[in-house]
């Protein structure tokens, strides 16, 4: 990536509460500090995202691991490299394996997902790309796998990350540029600046291909 198109707000210019959130981002990830340091230009936007993300992505009634699969599906389909090279530590602890992130754009044919995960990913696909031809079958599948509270929460989480990632991919930001020295939530092969550079120069790098 080249030069950032919107600068990072220096940590020392933030108030104490915002600094605490930035340290949490560095310590826990998803999101990593760089995107939050851009949002810090508009504190109302910073907190609107941070509070909403905590409430509907990190917390709630729907399985967190499913929400993270959908988050990375969106990364792959809109090609947001900054977000797509992160993994939720909570989702990994819940049992998600790296191979399940690798096959997201082929989820319907993949053996790496169960029916509930595939239904959730079809929801993410529809939010990103539009309703499939058989609308009744689409909704029947979702209702067979999720309660209505889960569908609302999951839909809001997907919609939030879809909008944010569609914006973040334009910014030119990358990892290990702000509050460097931590690797929380970084995907394998991206945990240091050197690893990140090597992985992104590989012909097998996921973003080297086409989206969707």
Region roles according to the model:
Residues 116-157:
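Acidic/histidine-rich alpha-helical segments that form the ligand environment
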Residues 169-197:
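C-terminal end-helix/capping segment
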Residues 39, 53, 69-74, 104, ...:
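Short alpha-helical scaffolding segments that buttress acidic/His motifs in well-ordered protein cores
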Residues 46, 84-103:
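Iron-sulfur (Fe-S) cluster-binding segments and ferredoxin-like electron-carrier domains
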Residues 69-86, 152-169, 192-202:
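N-terminal hydrophobic signal/anchor transmembrane helix of membrane proteins
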Residues 1-64, 92, 186-212:
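Mobile cap/lid helix-loop segments that border enzyme active or cofactor-binding sites
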Residues 104-115:
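Acidic/His metal-coordination segments adjacent to aromatic residues that form catalytic metal sites
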